[in-house]
């Protein structure tokens, strides 16, 4: 009886060991394949947050993070604070939408709304208290000014509406009506750029906006984001894809999904620490593209996003990606060692082994051996029965 129990224990331990070994093998095989541009369309794990989680408005507009790792999201109901465990809503006195969020070097959380802007600051009890800056804009008459972007330039915090710019130096606020109509502001390195409505791309200099690139050189489309690219800048347009600007010259940035980006309208973009470009669209979710233009993964409502309209993107200190959506918030674990592949159909069955090569991959399952080329799985003829192992012998 003791011998039988010992044998059962041995079998059980061996079974557990084999399962753990297989799991670890699959995890590291899949992870290593990501860096090689595998033929399998691996995707990161996505965590979705809905209204029932954060108890505020459906729409979310912008995201940032403080040096403690706390996330702040501009929401239809105000400013959301998330410490990784619990959510807290901070309303503006006007209870208006918070469109834009930005954290200054001093830790102040600047926010923009309709004819309102200011900052939240922690008091001695570690609670956030709001300070309005609107009334500091002396002799400025507000007229439907909604603050869509906040950034820093030349030692000042800059608030942007579609017709005005406001500059806060830490003491006073100066508001100016611009001759052109700024669509946005975005910073690359020490330079702040501004796309003009129905116009070209400008630089925000100390003495105002200066024309940089004519609209026709950017596909006659609005630039919605700028990101570092090999010592230059990658400008992403809403309808004409990307353009690389280096040494005063501009050229098209080609990707595997140019047609989709042009069709679904680029709206936001960020770059991860490992130089992956995360691009959010207005109608088809999020694309992850490497510097060479290869599609690494994409997420939309056909996969794990709860909404396809991306209104804000942020790459956090851990290299994970947050998306402010037209409905909810998405947390994409870009920095995880675990990625996964979900076949377009379930005929693959139980997976026992995986072999990943540069241009193809093989999956051994209880339904046979599958080969994946160009992201499409197909059953290998003659191997339609259960397969436990797949490996290489020589070059085969």
Q: How should each PLM-predicted stretch be described?
A:
Residues 1-396:
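Carboxylate-rich, polar loop motifs that coordinate divalent cations or form catalytic acidic clusters
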């Amino acid at each position: 009886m003791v011998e039988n129990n010992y044998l059962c224990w041995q079998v059980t331990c061996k079974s557990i060991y084999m399962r753990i070994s297989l799991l670890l093998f699959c995890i590291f095989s899949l992870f290593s394949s990501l860096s090689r541009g595998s033929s399998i369309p691996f995707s990161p794990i996505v965590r979705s947050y809905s209204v029932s989680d954060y108890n505020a408005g459906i729409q979310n507009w912008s995201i940032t993070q403080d040096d403690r790792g706390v996330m702040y999201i501009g929401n239809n109901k105000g400013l959301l604070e998330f410490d990784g465990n619990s959510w807290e809503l901070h309303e503006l006195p006007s209870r208006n939408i918070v469109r834009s969020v930005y954290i200054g070097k001093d830790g102040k959380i600047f926010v923009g709304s309709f004819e309102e802007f200011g900052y939240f600051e922690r008091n001695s009890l570690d609670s956030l208290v709001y300070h309005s800056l609107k009334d500091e804009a002396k002799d400025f008459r507000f007229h439907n000014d909604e603050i869509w972007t906040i950034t820093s330039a030349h030692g000042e915090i800059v608030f942007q509406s579609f017709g005005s710019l406001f500059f806060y130096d830490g003491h006073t606020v100066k508001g100016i009506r611009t001759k052109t109509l700024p669509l946005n502001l975005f910073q690359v390195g020490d330079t702040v750029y501004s796309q003009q409505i129905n116009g070209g791309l400008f630089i925000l200099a100390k003495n105002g906006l200066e024309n940089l690139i004519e609209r026709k050189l950017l596909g006659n489309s609005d630039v919605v984001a700028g990101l570092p690219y090999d010592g230059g800048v990658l400008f992403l347009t809403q309808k004409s894809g990307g353009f690389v600007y280096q040494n005063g010259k501009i050229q098209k940035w080609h990707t595997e999904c140019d047609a989709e980006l042009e069709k679904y309208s680029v709206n936001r973009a960020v770059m991860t620490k490992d130089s992956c470009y995360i691009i959010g669209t207005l109608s088809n979710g999020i694309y992850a593209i490497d510097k060479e233009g290869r599609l690494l993964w994409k997420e939309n409502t056909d996969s794990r996003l709860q909404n396809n309209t991306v209104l804000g993107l942020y790459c956090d200190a851990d290299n994970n990606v947050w998306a402010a959506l037209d409905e909810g918030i998405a947390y994409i674990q870009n920095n995880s060692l675990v990625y996964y592949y979900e076949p377009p159909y379930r005929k693959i069955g139980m997976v026992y082994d995986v072999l990943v090569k540069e241009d193809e991959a093989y999956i051994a399952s209880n339904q046979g051996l599958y080969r994946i080329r160009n992201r499409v799985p197909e059953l290998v003829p003659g191997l339609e029965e259960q397969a436990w192992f797949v490996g290489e012998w020589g070059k085969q």
